[in-house]
């Protein structure tokens, strides 16, 4: 099982601490260089949605209580290329003073391909690039997007030092700051929120055959063949893969993009938990099916770690053909409530003709 936990309770099975940056065959990698932000600043000074949320947070009574767990399994593959990370207290991990009441948590799943180096690298460094971004915490959405591209560029630098690191990974990260949930995705991992038993997808699968991605790929000089980007990759967005010819450009405008899509939601008392997982999970679980399964398990034992293991075990039973990794983040200390469905009120009506017939029948009884 592969897990990386940066502190906080409710972790997955084994291991702990921060994973090492991939070695360079006995050579020490240079310090990661910080590149200029790839995210353009808006021309006006309009405040971001997350900044407005923080200003008004004192007026909101609800505040989530986060606890998490994760689990991973090699599945039917011969090598393990998935990693995940759970940090229920991101600010404490990086020694940053909390700027708001409530949680400051970071979670991620990274599904490597062509080796595990890219997944390990992103798992080790993405959170740091977020926290150290000049726009954090004032504009978290912008900092989150920039951190993906910073990490991608830093991995390119690492690969230029040691070509054996060449590989790629999809990446999905979730931040819980106060009562704001931000999910950034590049690839085909998926995040699904359970809102009072209903599945709400917080990410979009980036497949080359998706019309929006296909248009972007072709505009960037690439093509889609048989569902594969340039006939080689079955994802349209990923970090790494700099070694693959024609995939990426230094300006970030190549067919294979590391820029994430970010979705934001203000959490309420009805939001129960979030599931983030690699495609090996979603190959055999529909989003609502996964929410229903996890909800039942949490009602039984209220343990996110055990819930993740049960999701992985069930995916293996359903013959998933990939590595498996999943993280469950609960937003309440209590288990999900049992939902009672009210009986529908049946409205009955009778026609005028039927009413006359009924009256005639009653009159006949009186006679």
UniProtKB/Swiss-Prot annotation:
Binding site for Mn(2+) 2: 111, 279, 322
Enzyme Commission number: 3.1.3.16
SUPFAM superfamilies: PP2C-like
InterPro entries: PP2C, PP2C_BS, PPM-type-like_dom_sf, PPM-type_phosphatase-like_dom
UniProt GO BP: regulation of defense response to virus; signal transduction
Cofactor: Mg(2+); Mn(2+)
Residue ranges of domain PPM-type phosphatase in the record: 67-331
GO MF terms held by the record: metal ion binding; protein serine/threonine phosphatase activity
Gene3D superfamilies for this protein: PPM-type phosphatase domain
Cofactor note: Binds 2 magnesium or manganese ions per subunit.
Entry-linked SMART domains: PP2Cc
Region (Disordered) residue spans: 1-29
Binding site for Mn(2+) 1: 111-112
Domain of life: Eukaryota
Enzyme category, top tier: hydrolase
A Pfam family matched in the record: PP2C
Gene Ontology cellular component annotations, sorted alphabetically: cytosol; nucleus
Gly residues biased stretches: 7-18
Annotated family: Belongs to the PP2C family.
Protein known as: Probable protein phosphatase 2C 57
Organism: Oryza sativa subsp. japonica
């Amino acid at each position: 099982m592969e897990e990386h936990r940066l502190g906080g309770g409710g972790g997955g099975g084994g291991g702990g601490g921060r994973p090492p940056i991939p070695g360079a065959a006995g050579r020490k990698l240079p310090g990661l260089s910080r590149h200029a932000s790839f995210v353009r600043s808006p021309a006006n000074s309009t405040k971001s949605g997350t900044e407005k949320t923080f200003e008004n947070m004192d007026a909101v009574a609800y505040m989530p209580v986060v606890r998490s767990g994760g689990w991973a399994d090699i599945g039917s593959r011969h090598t393990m290329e998935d990693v995940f990370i759970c940090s229920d207290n991101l600010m404490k991990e990086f020694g940053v003073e909390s700027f708001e009441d409530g949680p400051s948590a970071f979670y991620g799943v990274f599904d490597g391909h062509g080796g595990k180096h890219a997944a390990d690298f992103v798992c080790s460094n993405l959170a740091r690039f977020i926290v150290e971004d000049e726009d954090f915490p004032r504009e978290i959405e912008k900092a989150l997007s920039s951190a993906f591209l910073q990490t991608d560029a830093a991995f390119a630098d690492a690969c230029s030092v040691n070509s054996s690191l060449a590989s790629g990974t999809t990446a999905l990260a979730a931040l819980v700051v106060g009562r704001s949930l931000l999910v950034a995705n590049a690839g085909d991992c998926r995040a699904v929120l359970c809102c009072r038993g209903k599945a709400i997808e917080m990410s979009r699968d980036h497949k080359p055959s998706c019309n929006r991605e296909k248009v972007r790929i072709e505009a960037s000089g690439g093509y889609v063949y048989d569902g594969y980007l340039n006939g080689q990759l079955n994802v349209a967005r990923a970090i790494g893969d700099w070694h693959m010819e024609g995939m990426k450009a230094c300006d970030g405008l190549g067919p294979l993009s590391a820029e994430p899509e970010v979705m934001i939601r203000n959490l309420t008392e009805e939001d129960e938990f979030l599931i983030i997982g690699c495609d090996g999970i979603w190959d055999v679980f529909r989003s609502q099916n996964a929410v229903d399964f996890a909800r039942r398990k949490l009602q039984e034992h209220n343990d996110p770690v055990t819930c993740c293991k049960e999701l992985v075990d069930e995916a293996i039973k359903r013959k998933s053909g990939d590595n498996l990794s999943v993280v469950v983040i609960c937003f309440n200390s209590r288990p999900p409530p049992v939902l009672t469905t009210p009986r529908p009120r049946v409205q009955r009506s009778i026609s005028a003709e039927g009413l006359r017939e009924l009256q005639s029948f009653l009159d006949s009884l009186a006679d």
